[in-house]
């Protein structure tokens, strides 16, 4: 299991075409704070049918987009 597996599962189960989560929500779901390694781990999300659409440091949010 990867560092963010719980988050990827959450996004997949949600099933929305687009899902916006705050850094705090991601912390609650994944059990860890979002850090720079997220940029490397986000590639794993493709296996779950999603990709990271936008990371906003100003708003402290991440938008996940369904592939296809």
Give residue spans per PLM region.
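Alpha-helical residues within the helix-turn-helix
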Residues: 28
